[in-house]
Structure formats: C-alpha cells, structure tokens
C-alpha cells in the first residue's frame, strides 16, 4: 500500500470534498448504483416512447438525489431499503439501449444505429472491447484505497471519441478500423464479472477508463444490473459527452475523474481532432459544472508545453471561479511527445518536447495563488 493512500485522508479538504466517495469506499454507505435499485418505476420500458422514458427518468432521478442526501446525512439507511423491479437502474438500461439506436452518447452526435452494427466516429458498433483490467496503484492517492483495500480497479475500454495526436495510450484508444480492435469483447454480464473479480481481489473502486468509456455506456450501465457488490464507481473520462449521457451517469457515479486539456477550441481541434460539431471547451465546461453537483470530483489537467497562457491558466481560472470550492485538481506533469508527435515534430512544434520545469512550476504557482486544492493529488 502506498503510504500517501492512507495519509491523504488526514487532510480536511480531501475528506470534505471526497466525503461521499470515501464513505462508499470504506463500506459505510452503499454505492449510488445500488441505491438506484431502491427507486421503483411504473413505466413499461419496452412499450414507452423515448420521451416517456426520459420524463420518468427525470422524476426518478430527483427521487434518487433526495435519497442520496438522506443517506449521506444519516437520516435514512440505504442498506435497509428493499430493491424494486423494475427500478431506476432498469430504466437507465432501457434508455441507453434506445440511445444506441441513433447514437448520441458523445457530442459527435453521429446518430448512427450502432445497435444494428453501424460504425460511429468512435469506430465502434454495439460491441464493447476491454483491452485490460487490473488493480492500478499509480492513480491519485485517494483512489488507491485504505483499510486492506488495494488499488483502483481499472477497466480499460478500447477506442475513443477523441483522436489526440499526443495520446500516450494510442494503442487501445485509436484503432485504425474496427478490425484493429483486439481486446476481449464483453457483454454486460461479462463486464459485471470483471468488476466483481476486481472487487473480490480488494480493489477500492471500479474505474472505467479507456480509451473512453462514454462510447460503451450501453454495456456499462446494463452491467450494473448484474453486480451484487457495493463498490464506488469512478467515471474516468474526457467529458466530451452529451447531457443525456451526463444525466444517465449522474445517478451512478460516486467519483468523477474528468480531463480538461485545452481551453481554446482551436487547440482542441488541432491537437485532439475534436470539436467539429460541438466546441470542446464549451462541452467540457458544461459537463464539469454539472458533474460537480452530482458527486465527488478530482479534475485532471495535463500541463502541455507551450500552452500555459492559452490553456492551463484559463482552465484553472474557470475551475476557481465555478467549482473550485467543491473539487480537487491534479495538475499533471507527465506529458511527453507520443503517438503522432515524434513522427511529425514540424507539424506539432509546440508539443514536440517535454514541458519545462518552469512551465510546471508556473502552473503550480498559479493554482496556489487561486487557492485551488491540488497538492494533495498532484
């Protein structure tokens, strides 16, 4: 066990800002997806229109929000409530299945019928592929676990809705075609088995990562109906997803672990190949604000060489001005030229090097000046 995985919880700000996640991690409170089973639905999912499903979802989601508040305050016990069938979790499963038929999980909003085998911008049809899964000890200290729980139960999904030219995980995130996807094809049942296996080994959480998990939302949500272990769920995402996806996730996610890479849309378009249909920074800002109202959050910002003034400082300003009192921020210094950058340094001269010590220090100093809580997780 990493020593800081235990000592980090002595920090008052960490305990307060990650309170819900910690209570679920140590088993004092049930995970949100378990609480969804306590909320019954009267709508017959197979016969209802998608509009009717969303209307029912809005009503039940508010009930879940109230229940979470009561459980967290201690005025109600989540453990003693009985499960209902069908329930809010079943409703979410029906909704994501409908969404897959005109896919709008992410802001590319392809609207292709992936359920029938059509391929979206993500290069996926309905099949979900897992590249690997294991207990990860290199994540932020609060994710590693305490009290005999060890490692973050990371599940790496293949493919992505962004095509970052510098991606360090390009081998699984950027298959050239569907035929290049070589991971294990998983059903909801198999994905639940993977999560249960990680939990039985002592994982502190289930960490959905990639690639990008958003594009496999249908498999992930439906897998939760097959899980019996209460364990916190982490949504480790680029956050380039639609509000419909965010509403599905809000009632399931115990800890958000979002990226915020670029402030300027032109930087995102050039270096992430994203934003053609919807502005990357506008989407990500919207989703960060929404997520901060629905669970604990650690924001990741990768310091990019040459982008301190145009991106790093404005992103830190945004966090400080909107959600800085609710979140922790991991200011990451791990960037190195990868993927397409080393082969085309003349095309990407700004990021064809490591960030300098001064650039990293400038980012730290600026965050400190703004009063952001970053040192505990950076």
PLM segments and residue spans:
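N-terminal alpha-helical interaction blocks
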Residues: 1-89, 95-96
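N-terminal [4Fe-4S]-dependent radical SAM core
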Residues: 64-157, 171-174
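C-type cytochrome heme c attachment motif
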Residues: 104-105, 162-166, 254
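Short cysteine/histidine-rich metal-coordination sites, predominantly Zn2+-binding motifs
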Residues: 118-130, 179-193
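Long, charge-rich boundary regions
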Residues: 133-182, 193-209
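Conserved AdoMet/S-adenosylmethionine-binding subsite of the radical SAM
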Residues: 187-349
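Active-site-adjacent loop and "lid" segments of alpha/beta metabolic enzymes
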Residues: 345-361
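A cross-taxonomic marker for long C-terminal extensions/tails that follow the last structured domain
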Residues: 360-378
């Amino acid at each position: 066990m990493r020593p800081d995985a235990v000592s980090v919880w002595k920090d008052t700000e960490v305990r307060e800002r990650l309170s819900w996640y910690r209570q679920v991690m140590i088993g004092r409170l049930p995970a949100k997806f378990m609480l969804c089973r306590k909320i019954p639905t009267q709508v017959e999912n197979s016969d209802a229109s998608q509009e009717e499903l969303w209307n029912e979802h809005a009503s039940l989601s508010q009930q879940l929000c109230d229940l979470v508040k009561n459980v967290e305050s201690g005025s109600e016990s989540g453990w003693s409530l009985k499960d209902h069938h069908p329930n809010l979790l079943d409703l979410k499963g029906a909704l994501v299945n409908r969404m897959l038929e005109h896919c709008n999980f992410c802001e590319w909003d392809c609207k292709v019928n992936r359920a029938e085998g059509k391929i979206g911008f993500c290069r996926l049809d309905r099949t979900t592929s897992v590249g690997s899964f294991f207990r990860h000890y290199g994540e932020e200290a609060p994710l590693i676990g305490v009290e005999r729980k060890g490692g973050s139960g990371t599940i790496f999904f293949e493919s992505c809705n962004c095509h970052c030219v510098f991606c360090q995980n390009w081998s699984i995130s950027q298959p050239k075609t569907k035929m290049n996807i070589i991971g294990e094809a998983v059903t909801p049942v198999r994905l639940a088995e993977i999560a249960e296996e990680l939990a039985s080994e002592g994982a502190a959480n289930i960490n959905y990562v990639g690639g990008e998990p958003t594009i496999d939302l249908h498999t992930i949500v439906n897998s939760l109906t097959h899980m019996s272990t209460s364990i916190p769920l982490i949504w480790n995402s680029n956050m380039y997803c639609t509000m419909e996806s965010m509403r599905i996730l809000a009632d399931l996610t115990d800890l958000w672990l979002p990226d915020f890479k670029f402030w300027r849309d032109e930087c995102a378009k050039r270096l992430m190949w994203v934003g053609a249909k919807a502005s990357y920074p506008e989407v990500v800002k919207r989703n960060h604000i929404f997520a901060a109202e629905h669970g604990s959050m650690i924001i990741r910002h990768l310091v990019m060489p040459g982008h301190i003034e145009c991106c790093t400082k404005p992103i830190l300003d945004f966090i400080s001005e909107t959600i800085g009192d609710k979140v922790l921020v991991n200011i990451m210094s791990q960037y190195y030229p990868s993927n397409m950058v080393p082969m085309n340094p003349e095309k990407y001269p700004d990021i064809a090097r490591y960030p300098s010590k001064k650039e990293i220090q400038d980012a730290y100093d600026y965050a400190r000046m703004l009063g952001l809580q970053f040192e505990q997780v950076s």
